[in-house]
Amino acid sequence: MSSVVVVGTQWGDEGKGKITDFLSENAEAIARYQGGNNAGHTIKFDGETYKLHLIPSGIFYKEKISVIGNGMVVDPKALVEELKYLHDKGVDTSNLRISNRAHIILPYHIRIDEADEERKGANKIGTTKKGIGPAYMDKAARVGIRIIDLLDKETFKEKLEHNLGEKNRLLERFYELEGFKLEDILEEYYGYGQQFKDYVCDTSVVLNDALDDGKRVLFEGAQGVMLDIDQGTYPFVTSSNPIAGGVTIGSGVGPSKINHVVGVAKAYTTRVGDGPFPTELFDSIGDNIREVGREYGTTTGRPRRVGWFDSVVVRHARRVSGLTDLSLTLLDVLTGIETLKICVAYKLDGKTITEFPASLKDLARCEPVYEELPGWTEDITEVKSLDDLPVNCRHYMERIAQLTGVQVSMFSVGPDRAQTHVVKSVWRLA
């Protein structure tokens, strides 16, 4: 038995999909455990580029099981569209398994999400407006509708009818928007459920059986630690737990069955949406990183905010997710920058702090303390191993490992699978 969790160590968009896809080659099951179609990941497979939002990266390997876990919130319409997208490209999806306990996103969740973000104005969170937050709110309030409910028309109708009474009052009286009629949703969404019902099962059983049979299971996180609802920059966070601890809740696999946690970090830092960002760059270097790194959101197309590597952030990720390994991505984007900076601490009211503050008010006042390192000019996109990297690039990686306290076990120097390199296997048993 061997299991590996892949988590983002920053604010998402670290390249988790690429690393998950790479590690999937040696896995026999791949599972997502939180989030929904608010997070996109781009995967290159057999020369083709795919953009997925719900379905795990392992879907391209027909001999491997791909799991949408119970901790996810699933938009049935988006799922059907994503399945069609894959089928149109000739991808076999018969290896997909969808948890019967996962909650679903309905049109009223999306409308409420949009309206609430609009109402907040300058205080908006920066949500993707996909209905994720409202769906998780219903789950916590115990009025959510699960996939198992969607597949039973009578149960679905009963729960939907009950919820629409409350949601329509909220939409019409508070947001002054039009509500929904039962028939507007019932037939359409029941129909979506019927299109994917053959994939639905108890995925906790599937995953535990795989582990008990000695198979390798890979757990794929969405977003990143800094977007975790408990450990992130609250309230500028997602509505679930991307940290490694979220695996046990969102997949139905106990913590004793988790072996390694791989934190994926960009060689710099990016963020989409609002909230404090201590190392953010507003100069030509930041603009250059954004363009070379193609830093635009997979889901929204929004330009990402760009900054220097922040070891305070990744140390926080190491502690709250129990990172055993680090995968450093997009090193090639930094090529040609004469002097690189790494944030080693913050200055807050004249004092040096090395741990990430809980208070956003404090974080907004933090000034980064930088350490400068010489950059490199050599093209590194064709390197085949760690030893092939320029000395300055290796020193940069080594310093990141020292500052974060996590060994760099993988690194990537480009978007293709062949540009990801292993320093130490994360599938090791010890």
UniProtKB/Swiss-Prot annotation:
Q: What is this protein called?
A: Adenylosuccinate synthetase
Give the co-factor note. Answer: Binds 1 Mg(2+) ion per subunit.
Q: Which gene encodes it?
A: purA
Which positions in this protein are listed as binding substrate?
T298, T299, T300, G301, R302, P303, R304
| SUPFAM superfamilies, per database record | P-loop containing nucleoside triphosphate hydrolases
Question: What pathway, per the record?
Answer: Purine metabolism; AMP biosynthesis via de novo pathway; AMP from IMP: step 1/2
- Source organism of the structure: Listeria welshimeri serovar 6b (strain ATCC 35897 / DSM 20650 / CCUG 15529 / CIP 8149 / NCTC 11857 / SLCC 5334 / V8)
What does the similarity note say? Belongs to the adenylosuccinate synthetase family.
Q: Binding residues for Mg(2+), per the UniProt record? A: D13, G40
